[in-house]
Amino acid sequence: MTRKALTITLFALLALAPAGPAVGEMVLSQVIVDLLPGKPPRDDIEVWNDGDERIYVSAEPFEIRAPGTPAETRAPAGTPEESGLLVAPQRLILEPGERRTIRIALIGERPPSDRVFRVAIKPVAGPVSASTDALKVFVGYDTLVLVRPEGPTSEIEGQRAGRTLTLRNTGNTAQELFDGRQCDASGADCRALPAKRLYPGATWKQILPFDAEVTYRSSIGPETRERRF
């Protein structure tokens, strides 16, 4: 039989996962890099090979334009001079048990509104040593990078139409909405509501179980507040 290799790359979109996710033989220290104002404009992602074979890793940055809206697009970020984002190194070779870091850094001034990037960190095919047909399955991470403005604003507008709640981020930075809750008129039946990252200019609609007030917590980085709609 002729030797051949079939390589499949699968992407796990794990931007909302907690730190320390593991897929196959590659472990990342974090899957969200939040470059907040007042903090150093850089952060590191540690990549760890916890398998017993050498792995080859690539880190490819993309810019997400109009995130969270119907006009959302994804485009290669280009050079650091073009994109304002440095990702280095973009190629790694990790021996079994080896750990390396990928630096994510803002180049230049902070933007007036969020800039959103994804960095696809994934194993790539190396030499195939199998003497028969081989199937290699690689799973990578689409890590999220948020470049925040110098003066983030946190406005969210809420509108109710019957049991439809519409939320719109009218500020200049993404907010995480979580711990949503609504109770019936008696207060005896309370329901948890879904979480959402709401980007600037984005709108989110959901159908509520009741007609009563809704509460959410929202966060920008470590700062949180309660909101009522």
Which ranges hold each PLM region?
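Asparagine-centered strand-capping/turn motif at beta-strand->loop junctions
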Residues: 47-51, 165-173
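Terminal connector regions
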Residues: 107-152, 213-229
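Beta-sheet-dominated interaction scaffolds and their linkers
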Residues: 23-52, 91, 150-160, 195-198
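Surface-exposed binding patches on compact interaction domains or structured appendages
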Residues: 27, 50-98
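N-terminal signal peptide c-region/cleavage motif recognized by signal peptidases
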Residues: 17-19
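Bacterial N-terminal signal peptides that target proteins for export
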Residues: 1-9
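Intrinsically disordered, low-complexity Pro/Gly/Ser/Thr-rich segments with frequent PxxP/GP/PP motifs
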Residues: 77-110, 188-213
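Short, solvent-exposed loop/turn segments enriched in Ser/Thr/Gly
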Residues: 38-44, 98-100, 114-118, 161-163
